């Protein structure tokens, strides 16, 4: 179900398609514990989920479990397999979470997925059926209609913002909402009181989020 692979990109945790998240989390704990002295606290690894679209909502819990075990996820990879075919692994980010954001100057069309370990900034629209998975925050200078998952590394401090926030789904860390912002009103989604709230840009209140 899971395997650690050493590639030219470094150590990758490969998670194959699965049915039960709890089994995956337990196996991660077991494997890392068995490997004992191989890892040092704070070691960075890459994460690759074989069917990331199907399981993207599980990424925060997987990242959280790895952190509990002393490992940090430096990047998320998408691709079909890494066994003997390193070129099948497409690296969306070779930078750490603390890096500057990934800037996209185009519309993200239906069926397209953007994966980045830090912040994602889009100068364009995120169309319905598109998806963004970001380790940090997501800012869309346009209309956001697809699925946006933020805070996969940064956690609850991440935000999702757009000039028109009409998303099908917003996830920040382990919180999910299907709510939308006011139409044609620049809005920001952030975690407040253990839930995601969406507020107009000129009335957002971060001070009470903590």
UniProtKB/Swiss-Prot annotation:
GO terms for biological process: cell morphogenesis; division septum assembly; regulation of cell division; regulation of cell septum assembly. InterPro entries: CAP/MinC_C, MinC, MinC_C_sf, MinC_N, Septum_form_inhib_MinC_C. Keywords: Cell cycle, Cell division, Septation. It comes from the Bacteria. Pfam families: MinC_C (PF03775), MinC_N (PF05209). Cell division inhibitor that blocks the formation of polar Z ring septums. Rapidly oscillates between the poles of the cell to destabilize FtsZ filaments that have formed before they mature into polar Z rings. Prevents FtsZ polymerization. NCBIfam families: minC (TIGR01222), PRK13992.1 (NF010598). Belongs to the MinC family. Interacts with MinD and FtsZ. This is Probable septum site-determining protein MinC. It comes from Thermotoga neapolitana (strain ATCC 49049 / DSM 4359 / NBRC 107923 / NS-E).
């Amino acid at each position: 179900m899971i395997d650690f692979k050493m590639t030219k990109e470094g150590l990758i945790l490969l998670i194959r398609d699965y049915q039960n998240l709890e089994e995956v989390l337990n196996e991660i704990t077991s494997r890392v514990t068995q490997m004992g002295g191989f890892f040092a606290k704070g070691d960075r690894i890459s994460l690759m989920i074989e069917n990331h679209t199907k399981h993207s909502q599980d990424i925060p819990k997987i990242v959280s479990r790895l952190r509990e075990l002393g490992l940090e996820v430096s990047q998320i990879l998408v691709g079909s397999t890494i066994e003997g075919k390193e070129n099948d692994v497409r690296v969306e980010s070779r930078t750490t979470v603390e890096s500057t954001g990934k800037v996209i100057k185009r519309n993200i069309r239906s069926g397209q997925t953007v994966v980045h370990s830090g912040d994602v900034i889009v100068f364009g629209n995120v169309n319905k059926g598109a998806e963004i998975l970001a380790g940090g925050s997501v800012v869309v200078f346009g209309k956001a209609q697809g699925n946006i998952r933020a805070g996969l590394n940064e956690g609850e401090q991440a935000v999702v913002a757009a000039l028109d926030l009409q998303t099908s789904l917003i996830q920040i860390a382990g919180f999910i909402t299907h709510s939308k912002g006011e139409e044609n009103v620049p809005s920001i989604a952030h975690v407040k009181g253990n839930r995601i709230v969406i507020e107009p840009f000129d009335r957002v209140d971060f001070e009470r989020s903590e």
